[in-house]
Amino acid sequence: MENPPYHVSISKSEEIKYRQKCKDLKARIQEIQKGNQELLSKYEVIRRAVKRGRLERAILMEQLELQSEAKSREFGQRSEPSPPPPPEGIKIKISTKGAGNPSAKKLKISTEETSDTNVALNNTSEISHKSSNNSQPKDASVNDTDADFEQQNQVVQSKDEKITNTDPIPSPIITNLKTESSKSSGAKKATSNAKITDTMLFNHFSSIQKPKLKAEGSTLKGQALKKTLEDTWNNLTEEEKKPYHEGLLAAREKAREARRRRSAQNSAKLEKEKAKEKQKDKDQEQDTVSDKNQIDEIEKGQKEVDEEPVSEPTTSPILPPKNQEPIRMGGFTVVNRSSNA
């Protein structure tokens, strides 16, 4: 037959001490778990912030590059300061022909004010002539002054006629007078064409010709290769240089379009990341709520366990059953079956 289990008697103070130690260990475990959860949440927030910062930096760098190109084009087209305003009595009309090119703007002087000045000068000359005929000259100096005055009137009239009969005076470049047509696509193409220099065209030509020379088996390098390319470029005519000019424009437009597309992709990616982060925050909030509910349930069960009454240990000696002999060993009582049984 199997031996019965050992019966161990524990004092009340030891049992209370063990219970208190168990409570302390559970409280410590819960405190450590709570601290770990807080550290994990902080780490997740910092990781998302770093990722968002990197994306925003990439987008800002793209926008800065586009703005710098626009500013460089604007400053490249900025011309000399505008001339002083015309004198009073002269109206300036700006023709709308060739508004895309600032150098094609012309000033037209209206003849309204000049005709009025001619009429006034003619009237004054007639009055002075009549007065000179009616009145007898007293001195020779008076006649001389009248003659000088008439000559001045004739000179002024001849100048006015020349101004009205001549072609419109070409105006200098005026930066402040910009029409709506200058903001069209044609004006943008003109600005891009004006910005391209001979050095840029030569570099584009070199980038195209170098692979061709290498494929043909040329061994030129360094200054010799550069000299050959320069001689070839200088021997080309304007018509032969036109394809390289158009190719450079197409390449720059392609690069600009690629930058715009990259910027749009980065912005879309940032929006997706923000949406994912919002969804993750919601999920994390739900997890924290569920964890809190579980912790509350555990604490509630712990309180119920703590509130249960502790049974006091019996102080009466443990009597062995029949046919069993008690054996005392230290603080324990071991019951063995007798040999008679």
UniProtKB/Swiss-Prot annotation:
Keyword Nucleus: yes
Sorted UniProt keywords: DNA-binding, Nucleus, Phosphoprotein
Residue positions, PTM Phosphoserine: S316
One Pfam family cited in the UniProt record for this chain: INO80F
A GO cellular component entry from the record: Ino80 complex
In-chain residues carrying the UniProt-annotated modification Phosphothreonine: T314, T315
Keyword presence, Repeat: no
Biased composition (Low complexity): 178-195
BP GO terms, sorted: chromatin remodeling; DNA repair; transcription initiation-coupled chromatin remodeling
Annotated DNA-binding residue span(s): 195-263
Polar residues bias locations: 116-157, 165-177
InterPro entries associated with the record: HMG_box_dom, HMG_box_dom_sf, INO80F
One GO molecular-function entry: DNA end binding
Superkingdom as given in the UniProt entry: Eukaryota
CDD domains in the cross-refs: HMG-box_SF
Residue ranges of the region described as Disordered: 68-195, 236-341
Compartments where located: Nucleus
Biased composition (Basic and acidic residues): 68-77, 238-256, 269-304
Protein name: HMG box-containing protein C10F6.08c
